[in-house]
């Protein structure tokens, strides 16, 4: 700088200008190329967004910048003659190795410089012409821009920011690649220099580079504070600039707009030139990548040559290595100056004394010059009111520090390296994330509902609060047509009348229109079947009363009945067997109904003297009611001799009989007497009933071929024992639909089971299929099963005595499937209807061996149903239990060896039974009183006893009676009422009997 010229802030070297001047003076084609590339890159980066958006800038500022650059070039040429000599020496040493390449690069550089100077001159001329042609347009545009600046600010800022950020990103990527490559070269050179120079202090520059790596670590902690102070100073600087711009607002709008137009025009032209140069530089850069290896080798030689030149000669090359770190320059004043002075002081202590002095003088001169320039520039701005144009809202904020004049430059290599690495790492992550975002894309084609909660209605809410858990109410509706409706109206007046058809009197109708509804007499409801039953019972009572009155009158045959009362009875009566059709007929059998105890049937043989041709050849059966002894209720006739008989198990309306010819006959006592034969005897008509159904002559394949020994009803558990005080005969409606079984046993051991069937309707003309059915009858027998008892009754010793003969059969009342059969060998067979295996199969007497003893009668106890009595022909009486083969008790000499012909339990006392033998004796047994023999016996003579049966009412224990119905050889039948001691049960007699049986 000339001593007489006043120095201002513009005279101070800027970082870009200083690097440019040093590299141009060095004369190296490589350095010139790098400088051009960096400048073109920087100009394109700063000018691209401004040119595209037509931002207004100050043209005078650009002109002043060019003048200052020329002055710096002149100042540099005068201030550094020594550096130029060093560079010329360096050029001469490298001239032999790079003649061809240097010539090419120099020619290219000169052409570019010439083109640049020529283009600048043309730009000025074009700018003047454009300024003259578009002056009016610019004025209108300036006025329009000033008016619409505030409205377009935000919109333009967003657009410019997007475009500028895109351009900066591209430029930074290219710059990062170049910086990474330069960093690698610098690090390689640093290692080589370190190996070459080591820690020698004779080479201060190499030693300073060696120490730089260690100092970077200490600078990291200071970088944060420096950046913070830098931001604070930047904010303060912006405030000062804003204040200065407010003072300089006195400039006319015309001048401001002209400057903006000139600035935009120049920057646009510069942007075009720099864009063309940057494109050419890119092509040259690609071509020089191939020569990179050769350049590295040449640089090593250059470093070896520079060892003799000293630190002053190495300075330009050092500047070249760090040319890309212009963004890391910081404005230093205040605390930064003190820090720089402290660091320079530490370095000066390590350098030689002469070099320390030289460095200190340079630093003092630079600091003094910067202070003076700052003061002068501030005074100048205050006097002239000159300020820079206010930056637009859309201008990039990073450009303001570069336009602000600086007073000093400090190169922070550690921070620059750290920032560069951070930028590269962030850029890589951003690039990777953008690529991944293109690959990873969410698919919105499917939509799933994670929770679908429909609204809750009132019914569901009620069930949730008051209903049972895990249950749901359901309802159905049927019979939809049955709809009821309620209406409100007046009562309907009604009247009831009655009539009778056919009329049986004068009053055949009732009711009157004159009478009110309340006066009408309500006719009571009449139950006709119930009335009929009542009348029937009443008639029976009346008949009994009349019978008693007749007995009291004392007929001829009554006094003798009282004289015939036995010792075992309190009173006696005699049935009227002196009827004309019963005279000279002996009684062969007596049977009492177990359901209706007052009903007894007597079987009469053929008469000894002829009486009536229609009756003399027929056997008679008379059904008696012991309460009406004057005459039989029904008189039945049979063609064959009757050997056994029984009543139906439920009600005594059916009578079954077995004949000597093997046939089974049935009488239905409910039939109308008009369908039977009537005979007039002694001025009285008697109805003689023929059998309703007979198996004689039909069903020959299953019918018996030998005389029947027994016939028994097969009782069931559903049958209930009843005592009928009233009439034993009911109407057909009451008995309709009944069905049960009857078993018939002959002496050969054939047991037939018959089903009693009641037809729904009687046919008066008879049946063509059922030949055994009487015309108008409704009861018939259907064969069910046949059981052959001969095989089960065979014994190994029975061959000596011939075939076994069966004499009697009884079914177990509690289980009609089981039955026992008495034989003529003293054995009692135990079998079932389904041929099941039973135990024991045979009940035997206490004596071992087989004896020709007939088991004439068997009777089950009505109280202890598993216990039965057996009377034998040898006079022995056995008490068997169904579960034991041998008898519980056996009495051998109770009848003095006379055969037992009849044996029955008392219907009122569990421990009492009566026995009849063939010697016309009656024995009364009371096991609780004496279990060794009978407690009473009654011989009957001279009219001997033929048959005996017991009648009574077990349900009426207090007022009950037990009577013996005795048939004598003379054909008379009398009723003996037993004494109360044998009819009234004792306390707990049933339980005492069980204890006795268990012993």
UniProtKB/Swiss-Prot annotation:
Keywords: Cell projection, Cilium, Cilium biogenesis/degradation, Cytoplasm, Cytoskeleton, Phosphoprotein, Repeat, WD repeat. Residues 318-338 have a biased composition (Acidic residues). It is found in: Cell projection, Cilium; Cytoplasm, Cytoskeleton, Microtubule organizing center, Centrosome. SUPFAM superfamilies: WD40 repeat-like. GO terms for cellular component: centrosome; ciliary basal body; ciliary base; cilium; cytoplasmic dynein complex; cytosol; interphase microtubule organizing center; pericentriolar material. The keyword Cytoplasm applies. InterPro entries: DYNC2I1 (IPR042505), WD40/YVTN_repeat-like_dom_sf (IPR015943), WD40_repeat_dom_sf (IPR036322), WD40_rpt (IPR001680). GO terms for molecular function: dynein heavy chain binding; dynein light chain binding. WD repeats lie at residues 637-677, 718-764, 850-890, 895-935. It holds the Pfam family WD40. Belongs to the dynein light intermediate chain family. Intermediate chain of the cytoplasmic dynein complex 2, a multisubunit complex, composed at least of eleven different proteins. The cytoplasmic dynein 2 complex consists of two catalytic heavy chains (HCs) and a number of non-catalytic subunits presented by intermediate chains (ICs), light intermediate chains (LICs) and light chains (LCs). This is Cytoplasmic dynein 2 intermediate chain 1.
